[in-house]
Amino acid sequence: MGTLTDRLKAYAQSDMYPLHMPGHKRNLTWNINPYDYDITEIDGFDDLHEPAGILKDLTERVNRLYKARESYILVNGSTSGIMAAVSAAVRPGERILIARNSHKSAYNAIFVRQIRAEYIYPHTDGAGIAGEIMPEDIERQYCEFSDIKAVFITSPTYEGVVSDIRRIADIVHSHGGVLIVDCAHGAHFGIGDKFPSNPVTEGADIVIMSLHKTLPAFTQTAVLCVGSGRVDSRVIKKYTDIYMSTSPSYLLTASV
């Protein structure tokens, strides 16, 4: 059977084109020895949990790219960002409206925080593929549960279906709620004019994106972008710290 290293080496040397994540597609442009870049928080290299120098500059560049108020670089994937967003926006015992096609990390956050969940279903086509979340369905849920604190949806879906974030955000905000968008497969949205707008600029309050899925960054890299002040930034930071490793990889961070 051989070792995992043997199998990875054989795959890398094959003529197989990687039609899968990560987005760098085994690009050899950044041909480095990973051990040279694998360090810890030493003088001059900042701290991802308390960025004040070179990593603060990186987060500010992410802010400019996505037009976000604040951004958090993540090396535990969108999983940690989703759990942080849900935890920051909804207190234990409060209610969240969550789309049934959501990533399991959102459900894990609901379980860990003991949040009350209500569900909304995406429209499906004849092939059974999950489609968009309809704004009217969210309005109906608010009519039934007026105490919904946050709405969690996925846009784009794994199949590339995009919901009307602007209309959904307007509805959620009119009821005093927070809109969290899992945009894990849409980190390229808003970059140039050939892609849909990013949810940050469409009114979403917290957006989580996996840089490694569609952009040339290493697996596990992601960002949490804040689009408004509806959730206390100190609380968001607290939960990103809780859910992310205290030994963040500089190799992963550098690939951002």
Spans of features found by a protein language model:
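Conserved N-terminal alpha-helix of the aminotransferase class I/II PLP-enzyme fold
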Residues: Y35, I39-G77, N101
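Conserved PLP-enzyme active-site core in the AAT-like
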Residues: G2-K9, W30, A68, S78-S255
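N-terminal "arm"/small-domain region of PLP-dependent enzymes with the aminotransferase-like
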Residues: M1-G53
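Short glycine-rich, polar/acidic loop-and-turn segments at beta strand-coil junctions
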Residues: K25, G77-S78
